[in-house]
């Protein structure tokens, strides 16, 4: 196994032992669960970035696009989508909000890919531009503020995001989501040319 041959694995073990001796709370169950939860979030993004790196590219805009679609998801939960022409505000349920944000993120990624492939712009430059556009749009969306309460309201049917942060059997749901995404990505890499 390559992991055991590399120095990085042993450095990781040394760091865990060092911080475990420095603070016994570091090796507590709650601390380890918190670390695993955060690693899983970055792992999900890392799975997607793996495909970009395999093709020899780079995508600097990922974090900004995640921030933008997160800001839009928060806005859809807290404020809904005002339709001024009809004088109504539309509220979406969580699956619809997830679908909207995935489609928007995919669309922005498609724009990156189109600029890179059709116009022969270097991936670094194209994604740097998209990073600044996504950051700017996120700032414009809320004037630099954040959404602090995205629990939604039962009456509007937009609750459920808090389930993504919950646990199943003591393990955060996002960890299961990471392993599912990683497994699908692995199968795609293994069985497609």
Where are the regions a protein language model picked out?
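Alpha-helical transmembrane segments within multi-pass membrane transporters and channels
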Residues: 81-130
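Hydrophobic core segments of alpha-helical transmembrane domains in multi-pass membrane transport
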Residues: 9-21, 49-50, 101-105, 134-136, ...
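Membrane-embedded alpha-helical core segments of multi-pass
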Residues: 44-48, 69, 81, 104-111, ...
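A cytosolic-side transmembrane-helix exit/cap motif
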Residues: 52-54, 82-92, 141-152
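Single transmembrane alpha-helix segments in multi-pass membrane proteins
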Residues: 6, 17-22, 27-81, 114-124
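Transmembrane helix-bundle core of multi-pass membrane transporters
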Residues: 123-193
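Alpha-helical transmembrane segments of multi-pass integral membrane proteins
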Residues: 3-4, 37-38, 97-104, 173
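N-terminal membrane topogenic signal
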Residues: 1-9
